[in-house]
UniProtKB/Swiss-Prot annotation:
InterPro entries (alphabetical): HATPase_C_sf, HSP90_C, Hsp90_fam, Hsp90_N, Ribosomal_Su5_D2-typ_SF
Superkingdom per UniProt: Bacteria
Main localization, broad class: cytoplasm
Keywords of the record: ATP-binding, Chaperone, Cytoplasm, Nucleotide-binding, Stress response
Name of protein: Chaperone protein HtpG
Location of the protein in the cell: Cytoplasm
Stretch list, region B: 352-568
Region described as A: spans on this chain: 1-351
A Pfam entry, by short name: HATPase_c_3
Origin organism lineage: Bacteria, Bacillati, Actinomycetota, Actinomycetes, Mycobacteriales
Gene3D superfamilies referenced in this protein's UniProt entry, alphabetically: 3.30.230.80, 3.40.50.11260, Heat shock protein 90, C-terminal domain, Histidine kinase-like ATPase, C-terminal domain
GO CC annotation: cytoplasm
Length: 652
């Protein structure tokens, strides 16, 4: 008996994805079954966990399992579980639509999806494996009842349709059943006959052998009865379990194939990329646990969103306890996937207890050290390709640990790589930078900015280019944060070339230029004083500098001042920005600066009384160009544009 039947439209992105699945040229269509079995396994895990937590939930957990049912005559394959099930609302949320956080990115990916592996990549990145069923089925029916509820829900859609139906069921077995009305077999299109027992066995063995729950199927086999002349063959049907159910993390690494590890990674991470590195661990003694961790080869699309779920799966004596156990992995390692199986925790442990549990804290410390040691091994390997992939995908995230993990800060610094002026294409480690430092240099020079091009064209770089001094180019938003909190590396302090006074001259050069500096200080003293008063709303000091070679001026901050990029980051996040004025530094050899000095000296009294507006405007232009050159924002861009336009007009 059914009631409350609705026909609903798929979200636009969902329908696009379904079309991609229906017309997919992706050759490995077998993976649809892996996705359905993985979903069923999750549902069984959740039911057992819920039964531990909720004593009012009266469910039978004695025989939790997954069942494959084949109807050869009608070409229907059903994957059934007696797990947690779903409510009507959950069915619509999980199957009828996609997560809103990913729709814009998915729309872009769909428009670019032209390669053979596009379907698999999209499924993995957006966690929507259920849709892979439309690679092999003309129609899909899902029937489900949530544990503890009386009525069920049926969802149904056909290939090519922009709609789906959903209806309430007065009665339904607990759990979820997904029935696929299979397309005709077409081996040229890698579309096999999924009603064949041998094919289903092959897929389960390849992709799902490690699943903890029994995967059962009714199979036909021939038996011989009687003896002698009475001997005869008879076909019987019996239920068989298709998977070995042995947890991979309990097996020695030498006994597990790379293919098994890859499939297990895809199961626990709900991703479709391959693991970059496999990290098995086993600890005995005070705290007994086993772990199997993976470094992914591709960052998920939501790695930097609040919706991203982090943490590894937690088991206790092979009993699933929770997904995304944040207490076992810090935020900056949120990309690490895998399982941890502890021996001495309670089965009904809560997140609140985990936060205070000493054993969990010790396991976490060891896991973090092992992950960082693995990254270090990749970095020091002769073949750098794995490390380069890791750093490209996860370097920005790893550097967040410099702000939060003081115990491992030195290791994080060691395994980090940075762009620098030493090479246009290759990154450098801090150790390599220090090794190249010339004698007498006591600081690691760096500059932050939005892009390499912006940093390299900054006036602050001019003296460093002229002297051949290497500068780290830091363009990730997190760089703005950590460089202010990490004092040094290998005894060398970090020095921003856009903050404080930078002295690149040797003692001999200082002695040789001392007389010239004294002369310049005298010649420019009055101009500097006038500029300081004229621009006092924007700056706190004007001074001469030797850091410029081709630009007339630049702005620098004190050591603890915000950079323009950091100010923008704070404003974008709605945080208050401390009010601070910067220092305007002038190049005493630039024609614009010497010309302004001469013009001021000729009309000093009038200028001091504010009677020479063109000099005031020149001062504003000088300051404005310094702001723009470092990527800053003008307070009154309209006035700056008006003055500049007027000045340019006079030149014609």
């Amino acid at each position: 008996m059914t009631e409350h039947v609705e026909q609903l439209e798929f979200q636009a992105e969902t329908h696009q994805l379904l079309e991609l699945m229906i017309h997919s040229v992706y050759s490995n269509k077998d993976t649809f079954l892996r996705e359905l079995i993985s979903n069923a396994s999750d549902a069984l895990d959740k039911l057992r966990l819920e039964s531990f937590k909720d004593k009012d939930l009266h469910v039978d957990t004695a025989d939790l399992h997954i069942e494959l049912e084949v109807d050869k005559d009608n070409r229907i394959l059903t994957v059934r579980d007696n797990g947690i099930g779903m409510s009507r609302a959950e069915v619509v949320d999980l199957i009828g639509t996609l997560a809103k956080s990913g729709t814009a990115e998915l729309r872009r990916k769909l428009s670019e999806a032209k390669s053979e592996a596009a379907a698999e990549e999209l499924i993995g990145q957006f966690g929507i494996g259920f849709y892979s069923t439309f690679m092999v089925a003309d129609k899909v029916t899902l029937t489900t009842r949530k544990a503890g509820e009386t009525g069920g829900t049926r969802w149904e859609s056909s290939a090519g349709s922009s709609t789906y139906t959903i209806e309430d069921l007065a009665e339904a077995p607990q759990g979820t059943a997904v029935s696929l009305h299979l397309k005709p077999a077409d081996e040229e299109d890698h579309l096999y006959d999924y009603t064949q027992e041998w094919k289903l066995r092959e897929i389960v063995k390849k992709y799902s052998d490690f699943i903890a729950w029994p995967i059962r199927m009714q199979v036909e086999r021939t038996v011989t009865e009687g003896e002698g002349e009475d001997k005869q063959e008879k076909t019987i049907v019996e239920e068989q379990t298709l998977n070995s159910r042995k947890a991979l993390w309990t097996r020695p690494r030498g006994e597990v194939s790379d293919e098994e590890y890859k499939e297990f990674y895809k199961h626990v991470s709900h991703a479709w990329d391959e693991p970059l590195e496999i990290i098995p661990l086993k600890a005995e003694g005070t705290f007994e646990y086993q772990a199997l961790l993976f470094l992914p080869s591709q960052a998920p699309f939501d790695l930097f969103t609040r919706e991203h779920k982090r943490g590894v799966q937690l088991y206790v004596k092979r009993v699933f306890i929770m997904d995304n156990c944040e207490e076992l992995m810090p935020e900056y390692l949120r990309f690490v996937k895998g399982v941890v199986d502890a021996q001495d925790l309670s089965l009904n442990v809560s997140r609140e207890i985990l936060q205070q549990d000493r054993q969990i804290q010790m396991i976490r410390k060891r896991l973090v050290k092992k992950v960082l040691a693995t990254v270090k091994d990749l970095q020091q390997a002769e073949d750098q390709s794995k490390y380069q992939t890791f750093w490209r995908e996860f370097g920005r995230v790893l550097k967040e640990g410099l702000l939060s993990d003081f115990d491992n800060r030195e290791t994080i610094l060691q395994v980090s790589s940075f762009a620098s002026t030493h090479s246009d294409s290759e990154l450098t480690t801090l150790a390599q930078y220090v090794e190249r430092m010339p004698e007498g240099q006591d600081a690691i020079y760096y500059m932050t900015g939005e892009s390499r091009q912006q940093v390299e064209s900054s006036p602050h770089m001019e003296a460093f280019k002229a002297k051949g001094r290497e500068v780290l180019i830091l363009t990730d938003p997190v760089d703005e944060m950590w460089v202010g909190s990490v004092p040094e590396f290998d005894g060398k302090r970090f020095q921003s070339i856009a903050k404080g006074e930078v002295d690149l001259e040797s003692e001999e050069e200082k002695k040789a230029s001392e007389a010239l500096r004294e002369q310049q200080d005298k010649e420019f003293a009055d101009l500097l004083s006038w500029l300081g008063k004229t621009l006092e709303e924007n700056i706190k000091e004007v001074r001469l500098t030797n850091r410029l070679t081709t630009s007339p001026a630049c702005l620098v901050g004190d050591v603890f001042d915000f950079t323009p990029m950091l100010e923008r980051m704070y404003r974008a996040s709605g945080q208050p920005v401390p009010v601070s004025k910067r220092i305007l530094e002038l190049n005493p050899t630039h024609p614009l600066v010497t010309g302004l000095r001469d013009a001021y000296d000729q009309r000093k009294q009038d200028a001091d009384e504010g009677k020479v507006p063109e000099l005031t405007e020149t001062a504003e232009l000088l300051y404005g160009t310094a702001v723009l050159a470092e990527g800053g924002e003008l307070k009154d861009p309209a006035r700056f544009a008006h003055i500049l336009t007027d000045r340019l007009t006079r030149t014609l």
